[in-house]
């Protein structure tokens, strides 16, 4: 279950229209350690059109060679990507809570807000408080002066 503005979010219809994804925080109530990340609500994949489907497309100009398929992501069951966090969740899931920090309308905004909160909370400088060990795969805890 996710919480956003004090309300439980259990269904995709509870998000405002046009929401692309959200920035979230997973909190370990036992250790006080947290993880900040982002999650998209929908995944899109390209499926190559069959010969029959291509033949059905009429008109002039270039015909598409694929169809875009959009599906709801695994946001309901998602907890994060950090290995240590996922290990601790295996044995102690009841002591974790998930909350949504903010919503985003597109991919660029989602990445911006995730970075914004990671830097606001100085996650790389506080490894005792956060599971996060990198930002965008470019900035790492190990590269900072100790």
Predicted features by range, described:
Residues 1-146:
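Structure-specific nucleic-acid interaction/processing domains
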């Amino acid at each position: 279950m996710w919480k956003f503005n004090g309300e439980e979010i259990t269904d995709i219809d509870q998000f405002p229209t046009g929401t692309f994804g959200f920035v979230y925080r997973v909190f370990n109530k036992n250790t006080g350690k947290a993880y900040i990340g982002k999650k998209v609500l929908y995944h899109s994949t390209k499926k190559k059109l069959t010969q029959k489907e291509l033949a059905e497309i009429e008109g002039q100009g270039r015909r598409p060679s694929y169809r875009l398929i959009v599906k709801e992501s695994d946001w309901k069951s998602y907890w994060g990507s950090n290995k240590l966090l996922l290990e601790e969740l295996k044995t102690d899931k009841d002591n974790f809570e998930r909350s949504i920090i903010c919503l985003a309308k597109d991919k660029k905004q989602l990445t911006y807000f995730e970075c914004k909160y990671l830097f606001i909370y100085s996650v790389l400088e506080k490894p005792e408080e956060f599971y996060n060990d990198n930002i965008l795969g470019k900035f790492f805890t190990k590269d900072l002066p100790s």
